Amino acid sequence: VASVSSLLLLASCSDDDNVPPDVTKKNPTTFIKDAEKVAMLRSMKDVDGSGRLYEINYTADYKLDDVLKSGFTETNQLFNYVAYLLYDSLPGKKAQVSFDAGCSAFAVPDRQSGNFLMGRNYDFCHATEDGKGYKSIAAIIVHTAPEGGKKSISMVDGMQLGFGQGFYTDGKSDLSPLMGLPYAALDGINEDGFAIGVLALKENQTK
């Protein structure tokens, strides 16, 4: 099995279990009651202390086989099904996911170490409600190691789940949507060095 290292956002990714600040306990998990799930959601760490880059070890079963069998291809339809599978109770309002992006990514083998490197820029432009500025996003590095599957590292734009800068310790943001992190990834790399990136640009299709 190949060793994998990631340069996602030029941030170091480790398994160091730093305890998040107590203030995170104030953030609700309205639709998640299972103790292990709640503990996982509260284990996220703020990588540089700015509220712009977070990291989490996603240890729950995210029911990938069930999702693949469902055959859903439309984004909001998919996330409603993910909520059905992973939430402990369902909200009255159906899930809505927002996508508005412009980005680039790369994945290359490191000739010296034999590892695989992946990086990307996150230049998403999420406009404010008045259209006069842009919201500060929170990017989330997600580690997954599903039973019987491949370990991977992926990156999520938190704003697509409604999470902006500092959401994790604002005392009010419901952390329940974090259960859908494995399905909100825009790019990632697995332990074999297989990398996928989802990129969007407001340009005409190549002919």
Question: Residues of each region from the PLM?
Answer:
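N-terminal mature-domain region immediately after signal-peptide cleavage
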Residues: 14-207
